[in-house]
Amino acid sequence: YKTLEDLKKDILNNLNTAKDKKIADIKSNSLLTQLIEKYPFEIPESMLQAELNGRWQMMAQQFQTTPEDLERMIKASGQSKEDMLKTWTGDAEKMLKSRIIVDTLIRDRNIAVTPEEIEEEYKKIADGNGITVEEVKKHYADPRSKEYLIDDAKEQKLYKGIFEEIK
């Protein structure tokens, strides 16, 4: 930063961006919670078990260990893997139901994003992180990462459309 004023502007911009993101997250989570309550449906047990297993694997990665060693560590602390998975079940079900609702709405509303919209996302990411668009594109050169960005852009487009409809 060249001046204290530049620093202040950047801090204010970052705070506003974080605030806007938090508000959008709260609104979308509230919407999904209401939809789950209004339109209840069951998740197949196999889907729930796959999600819980994925969370267990991720936790093992975070502890930089194997799932088997993680289970031994959990047992040594007086808990069990089964008890831990039970505590995760409610959140896992809500997340899966939310994902199904979002995917269904995106499909039913034929929501797609154009290459121009993805370019705009690259620019927003670059501006928000103080890096170049080329650096952002390099990160998203991996097809999986780019697919995640595209899915996120579709989801944001869905929420924007829904919130415009209910104003």
Regions flagged by a language model, labelled:
Residues Y1-K167:
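Extended, charged alpha-helical "arm"/coiled-coil substrate-binding scaffolds
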